Amino acid sequence: NEAQMKTEVGKPIQQVNPALYSGISQQADNIARELKSKNVNVQRLNPEVLDAAEMQYLKYVQQGNNFLFPKNSFVVIGNNVIECATRAPMNDKNRFIVRRILKPLTKEDPSIRYIAAPIPSPSFPDKTLYIEGNDILVDGTNVYVGHSGKGTSSSGVRWLQSVLGSNYKVYSIDIAGYRHLD
């Protein structure tokens, strides 16, 4: 919860809430195991690949790390790999790991477009462009983007439509009271 995040700032979730961490980790492990059983190549975030500068990235704005929910930091829509711009600066460290996984794929297939959303201002202005992967659900050429005021911003929805072009229709879905669409 938000109050606990403020009092325990910078501490690993394993220390602050071991039961929650264990449950999330177990769920991720189960999903990975199931996908591997279906011959899906599963890539997991490994924070150990980050160098010291990457680990310290934006620490002066928000302490901590969040390597449990990598989908919030990027999304794949068709042949578009999109680095997101999240409201929580600590999530931006994920992009360094994801780049190491996805960038080589763009070299293998020139039809893949690798796009990075503009990085938000560290002063958190209301009109900043935020786009979060956990707010995005794709159904063919229809892209649904949750808008709660806690994640993706209206300007993020507009930016996504401009990046995807006329081949996709982006719908903004009001999800007040929820954190993310998925």
Protein language model regions, located:
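The feature marks the mature, well-folded catalytic cores of soluble enzymes
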Residues: 1-182
